[in-house]
UniProtKB/Swiss-Prot annotation:
GO terms for cellular component: cytosol. It holds the Pfam family DXP_synthase_N. Mg(2+) binds at D148, N177. Its cofactor is Mg(2+); thiamine diphosphate. PANTHER family: 1-D-DEOXYXYLULOSE 5-PHOSPHATE SYNTHASE-RELATED, 1-DEOXY-D-XYLULOSE-5-PHOSPHATE SYNTHASE, CHLOROPLASTIC. PROSITE patterns: TRANSKETOLASE_1, TRANSKETOLASE_2. It catalyses: D-glyceraldehyde 3-phosphate + pyruvate + H(+) = 1-deoxy-D-xylulose 5-phosphate + CO2. Catalyzes the acyloin condensation reaction between C atoms 2 and 3 of pyruvate and glyceraldehyde 3-phosphate to yield 1-deoxy-D-xylulose-5-phosphate (DXP). Signal peptide: none annotated. The keyword Metal-binding applies. This is 1-deoxy-D-xylulose-5-phosphate synthase. CDD domains: TPP_DXS, TPP_PYR_DXS_TK_like.
Length: 653
């Protein structure tokens, strides 16, 4: 962005209302260039943002934010919105530590009406905001902008049903429509679409409804008959359009890159006093030929070379890739294995499986709850379903994990990708809750691999079990093999790495924290403090006697975990040791018994964590290698211990 560019002069959405259409075209070109430059450098969501520039400008030309609220579904297509609402000077910090979020964030701007990150939530949120405005005597309009992909989520249709029933003036803009929504048919339907938003038609409709409704005794009944007749007529020309069936007016399709047309339709839509769906067709990746040709490759992308679109090469394999390879290897030997994803085939590493075993691959769409119950159904029919799902999206299916899977003790395997801190995407995408959510669930087993070989061993072991099993792993490079962790899997037992016979400090960790712990252990050794490492392998169940036997020779135990501290495995293990020490010495000498061991837990504290690199998030959360070193040294030198009141005696399921 240059000093004298149009974009540099846009301080807020009101400024774009002063521009001519020629200036708007120039502004769109500048915005495309800025998005391409910043995403090329920082990484981010490219194709979707390049496709909604004109739509975003048109929305802000017609409506007045923040008086009128715009809710962006998922939110990854909000870059233009951010730039024209006073954040263009900081746009270069997009997705960087302490920089702009890649998603709408109320804490960032009054123009961000609602925080989003997960799909299919916008219509529900927008409807709630609209009702809140009405109750507060606020006349502002509310617009939900949702992509056709997010329309595969059931929550979107729940909200449409509710909105149609309430008959409030909610505006839903569907971007693209390449899924399953039928196009209108014939010239008359196009006329009807134009007529629906014409001001004269709307005034006539209002006066007619009012006049008919005022007829004594039969007015309301007549209105009801006319309303049903109108819906029936629309159904003929809209081929059973689902939005009409929900009680919405329906407008479109509209060219999403023609700002004159967009503004004209939006101005008419703004005057409606009933819910309306406006279908806008856009080109994903618009203006960047490589993204137009292959929008999927440029949906979410790391830093790349703009000239050829190539991402910086990294020879290391990721945990996602390691999982994909291991699953294909297992499926080649076992025809019962099926793979399920919730619209994240590539992101979860299932593309190779899909190409090799298309009849055993299932994409449930953005419907995590359905995906889990579908997998449970497969398991009940004798299959071995593996549901690959991001940790952050697993949260959306907890009821199905408990009700449909675990109560029946069905052998569904959950491959939980992006467990632990997730770089760049912020609070809505952190994978910090899965252990705390799944540990209390009866019949559930949770494993945490630290390497490619260990992941393969765990998957092979899981496929031989008859209960629900979760295998959680981070969004990170995956070590090929850690020799100590290549031994066979024993239920509830981890692996001890002894660095010295004289070690008095033990550091326990989940697989995703092993590299940080290993680095910390090396630093401590250099400082003359020897530590041993215990890779827990299992977050559940825990072989308590085995674990207590491992820890009995250590005076200082530090528990490290890539999840929330509240409800953590580490807190459970700490309570197990404290309970054991208390019982060992007897209730009369409880305090003396606890002094035999000093313990501490390093995990993510009770807050939401922002975007940044994994190392920046580790440091910000106080669980980096440096913090582990400090905690171990403090534990070794302090004279006090954790009080008994902090330990919750929990019985392992």
């Amino acid at each position: 962005m240059t000093k004298n560019s149009l974009l540099s002069k846009i301080k807020g959405p009101e400024d774009i209302k002063l521009l001519s259409y020629n200036e708007l075209k120039d502004l769109a070109v500048e915005i495309r260039k800025e998005i391409l430059t910043v995403v090329g450098h920082n990484g981010g969501h490219l194709a979707s943002n390049l496709g909604v520039i004109e739509l975003t400008l048109a929305i802000h030309r017609v409506f007045s934010s923040p008086h009128d609220a715009v809710v962006w579904d998922v939110g990854h297509q909000s870059y233009t919105h951010k730039m024209i609402t006073g954040r263009q000077s900081r746009f270069s910090t997009l997705r960087l530590w302490e920089g702009l979020s890649g998603f709408p964030k109320r804490e960032e701007s009054v123009h961000d009406a609602f925080n989003t990150g997960h799909a299919s939530t916008s219509i529900s949120a927008a409807l709630g905001i609209l009702e809140g405005k009405r109750l507060n005597k606020d006349s502002g309009k509310v617009i939900a902008v949702i992509g056709d992909g997010a329309m595969t989520g059931g929550m979107a249709f729940e909200a449409l049903s509710n909105a149609g029933e309430l008959k409030k003036d909610l505006i839903v803009i569907i971007n693209d429509n390449k899924m399953s929504i039928s196009k209108n048919t014939g010239a008359f339907s196009e006329y009807l679409s134009r007529l629906t938003v014409h001001e004269g038609y709307q005034r006539f409709k209002y006066l007619f409804d009012k006049a008919v409704g005022s007829i004594p005794l039969v007015g309301n009944k007549l209105n009801s008959i006319i309303w049903r007749l109108k819906r029936g007529m629309k159904g003929i020309f809209y081929k059973n359009n689902i939005f009409v069936d929900f009680g919405f007016e329906y407008v479109g399709p509209i060219n999403g890159h023609n700002m004159r047309e967009l503004e004209k339709v939006l101005k008419n839509v703004k005057k409606l006093n009933s819910p309306v769906v406006m279908l806008v067709e856009t080109i994903k990746g618009k203006g960047y030929p490589l993204a137009e040709i292959n929008p999927a490759a440029f949906h979410g992308i790391g830093p790349f070379n703009i000239a050829d679109g190539k991402v910086e090469k990294n020879d290391a394999i990721t945990f996602t890739q390691a999982f994909g390879k291991a699953l294909v290897k297992a499926a080649e030997k076992n025809s019962k294995i099926a793979a399920i994803t919730a619209a994240m085939e590539s992101g979860t590493g299932l593309s190779l499986f899909h190409s090799k075993f298309p009849e055993r691959f299932f994409d449930a769409g953005i419907a995590e709850g359905h995906a889990v119950t579908f997998a449970a159904g497969l398991a009940s029919a004798g299959m071995k379903p593996v549901t690959a799902i991001y940790s952050t999206f697993l949260q959306r299916s907890i009821d199905q994990i408990i009700h449909d899977t675990s109560i029946q003790n069905l052998p569904v395997i959950f491959a939980i990708d992006r467990a632990g801190p997730v770089p760049a995407d912020g609070e809505t995408h952190q994978g910090l809750f899965d252990i705390a959510l799944l540990r209390p669930v009866p019949n559930m087993t949770i494993l945490c691999p630290a390497s490619e070989k260990e992941l393969e061993l765990m998957l092979s072991w899981a496929l031989m079990q008859d209960n629900p099993i979760a295998i959680r792993y981070p969004k990170a490079d995956c070590p090929k093999e850690i020799p100590e962790f290549s031994q066979s899997i024993e239920k509830g037992r981890g692996v001890l790495i002894k660095n010295s016979d004289k070690s008095r400090i033990l550091i326990t960790c989940t697989g995703g924290m092993y590299n940080e712990v290993k680095e910390a252990s090396a630093i401590l050794a250099h400082r003359g403090l020897s530590t041993d490492i215990y890779n827990v392998r299992f977050a559940k169940p825990i072989d308590e006697n085995y674990f207590l036997n491992i820890t009995k020779d250590y005076s200082y135990i530090l528990f490290v975990e890539d999840g929330m501290k509240i409800g953590s495995l580490s807190s459970y293990l700490e309570s197990l040791i404290l309970r054991y020490e208390s019982n060992k010495t007897g209730s009369q000498s409880n305090k003396t018994g606890l002094q035999n061991k000093k313990t501490a837990v390093l995990a993510f504290e009770d807050m939401f964590f922002p975007h940044g690199t994994r190392s920046e998030i580790f440091k910000g959360a106080g669980v980096s290698a440096e913090h582990i070193v400090q905690a171990a040294e403090l534990l070794f030198t302090e004279t006090h211990t954790v009080s008994a009141s902090t330990a919750i005696p929990v019985k392992e399921n």
